Amino acid sequence: MVKNTDDVSVSTPAKEGIMQGNGAWCVVGFPPCKDNKCYCCIGGRTHARYSTMAECRHACF
């Protein structure tokens, strides 16, 4: 049985990011960047951490 994670209440830090048409996101405040000091590429061609949004967008999209 697959559990629907939408029903789970989880406290997450505020996230900000930019999404591209391919579904990739660069976000801050998302693990492993919980301290809001780096940007993470989610759903893109990399899953690395970057120090700036510009670096993340260039690598991720």
UniProtKB/Swiss-Prot annotation:
InterPro entries: Meg
Pfam families linked to this entry: Meg (PF24153)
This protein's UniProt keywords: Disulfide bond
Tissue distribution: Ubiquitous.
Coiled-coil stretches noted in the UniProt entry, renumbered to this chain: none
Family stated for the protein in its record: Belongs to the MEG family.
Name of the protein in its database record: Protein MATERNALLY EXPRESSED GENE 6
Source organism per UniProt: Zea mays (Maize)
